[in-house]
Amino acid sequence: MAAKLIAFDEEARRGLERGMNQLADAVKVTLGPKGRNVVLEKKWGAPTITNDGVSIAKEIELEDPYEKIGAELVKEVAKKTDDVAGDGTTTATVLAQALVREGLRNVAAGANPIGLKRGIDAAVARISEELANLSKEVETKEQIASTASISAGDPQIGEYIAEAMDKVGKEGVITVEEGQTFGLELELAEGMRFDKGYISPYFATDLERMETVLEDPYILIANQKISNNNEFLPVIEKVLQAGRPLVVIAEDVEGTALQTLVVNKIRGTFKSVAIKAPGFGDRRKAMLQDIAILTGGQVITEEVGLKLENTELDMLGRARKVVVTKDETTIVDGAGDASAIAGRVNEIRAEIERTDSDYDREKLQERLARLAGGVAVIKAGAATEVELKERKHRIEDAVRNAKAAVEEGILPGGGVALLQASIAAFEKLELEGDEAIGASIVRRAVEEPLKQIAINAGYEGGVVVEKVKSLEPGIGLNAATGEYTDLFKDGVIDPTKVTRSALQNAASIAGLFLTTEAVIAEKPEKPAANNAGGDMGGMDF
């Protein structure tokens, strides 16, 4: 086992703080509408230029073992805030830095870290309540567009996201893909999309786009492999007599069954497409059942006594259109009963509430989105690959940001909500001793995001903070224009969830810093001595 380094008390905490400061100082220059960019060197390929806090944080690796741990703890704040809300990473980092700086100063002066932590937690809880009181529900498409525009730093992206959410609903899927042209495109699929394409390219009906488009098809949904023609032909004959195309979604289609479909497609006698079922094991069963409910069909499986050769037309699903590419399938306007779909949606929601696994929750949410909403695809194009990656990442963040706004409402942006919520919160907060000192640490820390936004925009941070304290709630500095205005009217807004998550996650990590009494780190290994002699005595190799 490798040797360890151990540091105690002040030495331990200061080591962590140095690491945190290096990371936070690199990240906080990006805050606000006038935030600067940071260039990230890559081992391979061109460097990346970004102003996304979490991307910058991920790149920072420090040499000193204690500093490295400090930086990693703050990375966790940024990552957690990004995962939950899609934005607010830089705000969370700035808050964490301010809380730790003020907290460690008080610990060094003799304050009890546990008392400080209790005070910090009490103040954060009160401010979170005040944020909820200040919050307004998202009522218009324009508000969604404003929120997403601020996150992405581009009004056009905001408009496209608002349009997409308007079409697919708050639980609908909005995906971001790389487009083939400059600018943005929005495609809508009012149905279900999953990541499995046709088994054979011979099924393509549009050879230019290499996709299969079938209008008003029957859909055979089978939780089994289909390889034997004897059991499969009765189904094909019934569909052929009905004069409709056939979509087969099964564990696999192979052998003579696949040959029959391909040969008839090439001859033009019968349009069809075979698709492998999405997922594995129990998840595949559940997804096939989702497809069956959406299309009004049944899952053909011997587990429930349904055999392929006995399948009738009324057991097959229906849809207005099915589009299949080599990678994905989109079912548009399934013929399923609305009440059955609603029942299935409620069932999945209940499962989401019950599960403890993050992975299961994510997969259940994907299933919920496929059933409850449609699918919107935003295609982004750019001049260079570096620009394209950065733009795609910004759009993905902005989508999560817009969904957070719909979920919990919106607040005045620009760091103003935290400051104004804290003024109201501290009027009602009665603490004593070290707890009161802990609360005062939070009071000073919540000024930092506004201060940093002002500094990045070229203003004097302290002056701006004092000015905003004297203004009515909702009035603050619009750093893009340099004017003090009604931020809701100007569209300078942040999702409540983003601001709340940033504060709570920052306070959580600050508490860990303050109550740390020892740090145990890996001892850096010395580089191995070079055994080869400097002079090889004229030897040839």
Swiss-Prot record:
Subunit structure of this chain's protein: Forms a cylinder of 14 subunits composed of two heptameric rings stacked back-to-back. Interacts with the co-chaperonin GroES.
Enzyme Commission identifier(s): 5.6.1.7
Listed InterPro entries: Chaperonin_Cpn60_CS (IPR018370), Cpn60/GroEL (IPR001844), Cpn60/GroEL/TCP-1 (IPR002423), GroEL-like_apical_dom_sf (IPR027409), GROEL-like_equatorial_sf (IPR027413), TCP-1-like_intermed_sf (IPR027410)
Organism lineage: Bacteria, Bacillati, Actinomycetota, Actinomycetes, Streptosporangiales
Similarity field: Belongs to the chaperonin (HSP60) family.
The protein's name: Chaperonin GroEL 1
Function as written in the Swiss-Prot or TrEMBL entry: Together with its co-chaperonin GroES, plays an essential role in assisting protein folding. The GroEL-GroES system forms a nano-cage that allows encapsulation of the non-native substrate proteins and provides a physical environment optimized to promote and accelerate protein folding.
Residue runs in coiled coils: none
Catalytic activity: ATP + H2O + a folded polypeptide = ADP + phosphate + an unfolded polypeptide
GO molecular-function term, one example from the UniProt record: ATP-dependent protein folding chaperone
EC class: isomerase
Localization (cell): Cytoplasm
Major localization listed first in the record, in broad terms: cytoplasm
Biological processes per GO annotation: protein refolding
Gene encoding the protein: groEL1
Presence of the UniProt keyword Chaperone in the record: yes
Positions annotated to bind ATP: T30, L31, G32, P33, D87, G88, T89, T90, T91, G414, N478, A479, A480, D494
Pfam families: Cpn60_TCP1
Keywords (A to Z) from UniProt: ATP-binding, Chaperone, Cytoplasm, Isomerase, Nucleotide-binding
Species in which this protein is naturally found: Thermobifida fusca (strain YX)
GO cellular component: cytoplasm
